[in-house]
């Protein structure tokens, strides 16, 4: 999507990046992307704050604490970025440009794949010749994405698409969305456990914006991000996805090669410089 961004308008917004980070561990691609985002915001004069929550094992509680920290600040936009997500910092500015107070982008996110390899999609790409020129392109067909479209809708790749659910791994939420949520669902106020912090000492209530729950009508078990989207949509707000954004979702993978299988295929079991050179020439 071609989006004209007015930097002077973006400077009116303040970006609060929140990352729940159990064990204080993050991925290298996330670290590099966050550093690039910090540099980009500094270059354009956009105020940005990074907030990390370490050692909270319950993700629902961690996200609620992050939101409370945001709401007690004067920042305008909260961006959840999970510690295993790599991203293009320009996409963050695009989300901010789209999510103005006048727009109906109450929640807007980028699309990222789940940590799985969908071999049938890779096979389909190979059969259709998508990897004939460069086999490295097969990585584009890996994984199922973390969102569910609105039933009966058609998604256009080059513009924001309304969805029923999307993940918090790369999700922007403006302040007004949380305020409307709190107003519509006053029963979500609760007393947080004491966590040895001056802001969470059990003396005041905060809102439960995130919770995992079984949805009554469908019987589905909703994760905390899908539950949040469900509740937001139930009171007339909207959830959007930017299909053109490219995100990386890092995880562990077990490599299980098989020498007899490679022999049957007729390929080298070790690194073959000649085959690699052929691939590079085709790029």
Model regions and ranges:
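N-proximal low-complexity "stem/linker" segments adjacent to membrane-targeting elements
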Residues: 1-57, 61, 281-283
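C-terminal catalytic/acceptor-binding lobe
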Residues: 2-16, 183-283
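Glycine-rich phosphate-binding loop at the start of an alpha helix
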Residues: 60, 64, 226
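Active-site nucleotide-sugar/metal-binding loop of Leloir-type enzymes
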Residues: 64-77
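Conserved catalytic core of nucleotide-sugar-dependent glycosyltransferases
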Residues: 67, 88-212
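Hydrophobic pocket-lining residues that define ligand/cofactor binding sites across diverse proteins
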Residues: 70, 99, 232
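Short beta-strand-to-loop acidic/aromatic patch adjacent to the donor-nucleotide binding site
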Residues: 75-86
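Short, Asp-centered acidic motifs that coordinate Mg2+ and/or phosphate
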Residues: 77, 106-107, 239
């Amino acid at each position: 999507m071609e989006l004209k961004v007015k930097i002077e308008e973006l400077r009116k917004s303040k970006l609060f990046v929140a990352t729940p980070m159990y064990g204080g561990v993050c991925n290298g691609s996330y670290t590099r992307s966050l550093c690039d985002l910090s540099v980009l915001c500094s270059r354009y004069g956009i105020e940005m704050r990074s907030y990390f929550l370490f050692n909270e094992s319950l993700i629902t509680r961690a996200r609620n604490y992050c939101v409370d920290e945001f709401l007690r600040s004067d920042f305008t936009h909260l961006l959840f970025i999970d510690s295993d997500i790599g991203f293009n910092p320009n996409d963050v500015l695009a989300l901010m440009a789209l999510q103005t107070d006048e727009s109906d982008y109450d929640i807007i996110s980028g699309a990222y794949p789940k940590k799985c390899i969908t071999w049938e999609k890779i096979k389909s790409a190979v059969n259709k010749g998508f990897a004939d020129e460069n086999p490295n392109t097969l990585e584009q067909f890996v994984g199922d994405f973390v969102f569910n479209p609105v039933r009966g809708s058609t998604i256009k790749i080059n513009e924001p698409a309304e969805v029923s659910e999307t993940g918090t791994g790369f999700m922007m939420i403006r302040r007004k969305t949380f305020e409307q949520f709190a107003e519509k669902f006053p029963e979500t106020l609760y007393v947080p456990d004491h966590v040895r912090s001056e802001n969470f000492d059990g003396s005041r209530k905060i809102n439960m914006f995130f919770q995992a729950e079984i949805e009554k009508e469908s019987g589905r078990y909703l994760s905390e991000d899908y539950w949040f989207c469900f509740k937001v949509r139930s009171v007339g707000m909207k959830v959007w996805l930017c299909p053109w954004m490219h995100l990386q979702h890092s995880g562990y993978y077990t490599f299980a090669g098989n020498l007899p299988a490679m022999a049957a295929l007729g390929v080298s079991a070790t690194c073959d410089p000649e085959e690699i050179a052929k691939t590079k020439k085709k790029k």
